[in-house]
């Protein structure tokens, strides 16, 4: 399945389609409002290495209920659904502050959450706290781009030291917490 995802990524990298970007959260470090889908994939999508990590973690967790904050073009969603084809996945793109309560209502619990929708500390911490009410002892949260900025790294440190967290793993650009 991973080979199919990477074939799709390669195919989309060549696409002439232009995507209109909307700004949510800290946004992108790229100044463009419109860009070719290939450029968006290169700048915003999960890498093959991190996609493989998400795939293996979802499989290992046997995750049935997965929440993703920050869909972009859906590459990470494909890794998650490939690992767990029968899982219920809610993937949010855009204004997560408005969409998160509805997304949480659609899942009875959270087995895995991938946070990649905002690179600002305050919203990231708020989303983390909102999701805490839906965890169990085998839930895993994965945070992308924990070193995207000093602010994001400080948010990661607060999350890693939260009293509900039993294990935190700093993978430099990804952070994982277990409960």
Where do the PLM segments sit?
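A short alpha-helical cap/connector motif
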Residues: 1-114, 118-142, 146-178
């Amino acid at each position: 399945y991973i080979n199919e995802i990477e074939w799709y990524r390669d195919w989309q990298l060549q696409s002439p389609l232009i995507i209109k970007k909307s700004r949510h959260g800290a946004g992108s470090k790229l100044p463009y409002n419109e860009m070719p889908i290939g450029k968006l994939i290169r700048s915003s999508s999960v890498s093959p290495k991190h996609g493989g990590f998400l795939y293996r973690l979802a499989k290992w967790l046997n995750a049935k209920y997965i929440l993703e904050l920050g869909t972009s073009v859906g590459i990470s969603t494909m890794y998650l659904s490939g690992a767990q084809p029968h899982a219920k996945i809610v993937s949010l793109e855009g204004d997560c502050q408005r969409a998160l309560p509805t997304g949480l209502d659609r899942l009875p619990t959270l087995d895995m959450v991938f946070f990649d929708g905002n690179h600002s500390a305050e919203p990231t911490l708020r989303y983390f706290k909102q999701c805490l009410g839906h965890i169990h002892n085998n839930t895993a949260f994965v945070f992308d781009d924990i070193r995207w900025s000093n602010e994001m790294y400080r948010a990661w440190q607060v999350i890693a030291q939260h009293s509900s967290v039993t294990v935190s793993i700093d993978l430099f650009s990804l952070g994982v917490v277990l409960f």
